[in-house]
């Protein structure tokens, strides 16, 4: 493994432990050349998952792209990086559980929209405003009212 500090290819594993319910191995490494310590993660390579975009083009599912969208939506909100990573994990697991190699970007967005209100309502509205591309204030208000209806129903249960 190349050291991110000195770029030498000689590191040793100091600590290794499973994370993410055993699906990922976290390894602490130390460069034998400069003694810089860094962390790597190993996960099983799975068949590529393609996302079909609105215009019909296909691109590989990108966890980082989804995480960046969540980070933007949750900016300056009390949402931890761990929570956002868990959302990405949950969405990817749901998609892979379908057993398909392709999924629409709409389905990916809907999976996120199903989880996000339980984490942070403001992040949900921000994500929805980009994902649903609100054209005007009326569409935005309709989304808010729908969310408030669901919240009220949840409170009554």
Curated annotation (Swiss-Prot):
Its cofactor is Zn(2+). PROSITE patterns: ATP_CONE (PS51161). Keywords: ATP-binding, DNA-binding, Metal-binding, Nucleotide-binding, Repressor, Transcription, Transcription regulation, Zinc, Zinc-finger. One of its GO terms (molecular function) is ATP binding. Binds 1 zinc ion. Pfam families: ATP-cone, Zn_ribbon_NrdR. A zinc finger (unnamed) spans 3-34. Belongs to the NrdR family. NCBIfam families: transcriptional regulator NrdR. This is Transcriptional repressor NrdR.
